[in-house]
Amino acid sequence: MSVNPHTVPFENTPGVRATDDISRHLADLRYPLHLSFKILALASQATVTDATGKTVIYTKQKMFKFREHVEIFTDKSKATQLADINASKVIDWSARYNSTDASGQPIGSVGRKGWRSIWRAHYETFNPGDDIPDFSIREENPGSKVMDSLLGGIPILGMATGYLFHPKYLATRTSGQAVMRLTKVAAFWEGRFKVEKIGELSPREELNLILSFLMLVMLERKRG
């Protein structure tokens, strides 16, 4: 039986290129992670830090493009690129967002689950080489997201929504096993989220889900 090398422990997959780079980058990661967006920035900028304050990911999305393109760096210096995310087609509801590492090797992809995502966020994440989703990301408390979106656009009042409503998103395997959760946390002037790892993941799966959560937050912000 063939085995997808991206879903098993990395010490058992010596043939996967660039795997060691990702494994080393995530080796000393301490959860929970903290994802922050600069709401007032002209471009979409996001930073992911771990529990020790170490920067894990920094991105500044390219603006005014017909097709989504997000460059992922290891820190704000942008000296080392960790990954690249590109939309499979011109921006629409069915677009898939494909992640590759610095050498061009696939990390995985994420996309909205059809029309269900209009009312309740539902995304699917795929490991490289898989045609069926390996993970499902669902909004756990959609009412909170609706109120956060409705009030977030109201001057002054919108500043307080970060303290009142905390949308949560849970990533599960097809078996139903929960592996990672994203929760919006209280903050003024920026969007802040907490990422908790609650299940076993290979390093590439782990990065795939972190990037999937990153894209989810960016896309949900645009959706309102």
Predicted regions and their residues:
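Intrinsically disordered, low-complexity proline/glycine-rich segments
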Residues: S2-G224
